[in-house]
């Protein structure tokens, strides 16, 4: 895990990605289905990511959780609807924990299943006769070295950073309180948003007012976004940071060579 994922925060992105894809899979069957993601910071120091998506059956758990590189999304007809498809995301959790527990009940039927994997490569799978809602939850027991990541303010900042644009509501639960931490309908992705709304949003994101804002869209790459013109002089050699999203999941805040070198006076928000 540590060789694949250099950033210990990555597990938040990967678990949110799995939640979103599970809900999307169920919405592809029932477009009126209302999905949600719940994240719990518990007093016993466990962290739980829960979704009400499509869930997993026993044979799917064996195939997709116990074999590195297997993915339930890669070869499906609607694969383009999903964020992830490589089947290694769960490994990112082992950077911050020695044990991962996945509890799931499939919308397609079958008994609820519980899979517990450990950092040494061993795992245990059990079936349950207890009633549980459709969907999945992942339970982590953080390592001592990484406990600081699970302090409320720190964890919330990471969660919002990756998830604030995702299309389903994300609720953070802490000390008996529930808080919505994302905006499922962000203004910069709203084609009806006014110029003032775009400028106000850009000022909030980039901590600087812009002279103007321009929408961008490419049909071939299915890329949409907003370009912001900076109101001050910058050096030609300065590389501005941007925000790049993949299906609304934060991918990068680096320059990424998105713009030509002469566009040093531009910052942008992009979703692909």
Question: What is the predicted role of each segment?
Answer:
Residues 1-149:
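GHKL (Bergerat-fold) ATPase N-terminal catalytic module, capturing the glycine-rich phosphate-binding loop
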Residues 82, 102-124, 143-148, 153-272:
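GHKL/Bergerat-fold ATPase module in large chromosome/replication-associated machines
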């Amino acid at each position: 895990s540590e060789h694949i994922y250099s950033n210990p925060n990555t597990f938040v992105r990967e678990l949110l990605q799995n939640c979103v894809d599970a809900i999307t899979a169920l919405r592809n069957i029932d477009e009126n289905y209302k999905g949600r993601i719940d994240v719990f910071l518990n007093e016993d120091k466990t962290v739980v990511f829960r979704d009400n998506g499509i869930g997993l059956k026993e044979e799917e758990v064996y195939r997709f959780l116990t074999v590195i590189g297997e993915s339930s999304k890669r070869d499906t007809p609607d694969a383009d609807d999903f964020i992830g498809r490589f089947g290694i995301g769960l490994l990112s959790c082992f950077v911050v924990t020695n044990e991962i527990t996945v509890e799931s009940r499939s919308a397609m039927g079958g008994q609820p299943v519980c899979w517990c994997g450990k950092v040494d490569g061993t795992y245990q799978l059990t079936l349950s006769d207890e009633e549980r809602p459709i969907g999945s939850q992942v339970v982590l027991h953080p390592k001592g070295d990484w406990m600081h990541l699970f302090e409320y303010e720190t964890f919330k900042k990471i969660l919002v950073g990756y998830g604030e644009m995702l299309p389903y509501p994300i609720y953070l639960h802490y000390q008996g309180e529930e808080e919505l931490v994302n905006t499922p309908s962000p203004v910069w992705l709203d084609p009806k948003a006014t110029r003032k709304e775009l400028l106000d949003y850009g000022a909030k994101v980039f901590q600087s007012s812009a002279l103007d804002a321009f929408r961008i869209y490419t049909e071939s790459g299915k890329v949409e976004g907003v370009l912001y013109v900076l109101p001050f002089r910058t050096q030609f050699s300065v590389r501005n940071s941007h925000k790049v999203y993949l299906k609304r999941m934060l991918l990068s805040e680096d320059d990424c060579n998105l713009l030509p070198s002469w566009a040093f006076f531009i910052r942008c928000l992009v979703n692909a």
